[in-house]
Amino acid sequence: SRRERTIYTPEQLEAMEEVFGVNRYPDVSMREELASRLGINESKIQVWFKNRRAKLRNLE
């Protein structure tokens, strides 16, 4: 009964990567704006940024 893995479209990934390039820690209003623009839950966006920062640390 685990939840399904979220699969993001290339457009969604591009938009999130673009924000990440400017700000690795977007605040809730920025995440909400992204969420409504991309049609994703804000919580999913929060998790994506958390994981993206972890990925960045692993690459360093």
Curated annotation (Swiss-Prot):
Gene3D superfamilies: Homeodomain-like. One of its GO terms (molecular function) is DNA-binding transcription factor activity, RNA polymerase II-specific. The keyword DNA-binding applies. The keyword DNA-binding applies. It is found in: Nucleus. Its main location: nucleus. PROSITE patterns: HOMEOBOX_1, HOMEOBOX_2. Residues 1-60 bind DNA. InterPro entries: HD (IPR001356), HD_metazoa (IPR020479), Homeobox_CS (IPR017970), Homeodomain-like_sf (IPR009057), HTH_motif (IPR000047). Keywords: Developmental protein, DNA-binding, Homeobox, Nucleus. GO terms for cellular component: nucleus. It holds the Pfam family Homeodomain. SUPFAM superfamilies: Homeodomain-like. Belongs to the paired homeobox family. Bicoid subfamily. This is Homeobox protein EgHBX4. It comes from Echinococcus granulosus.
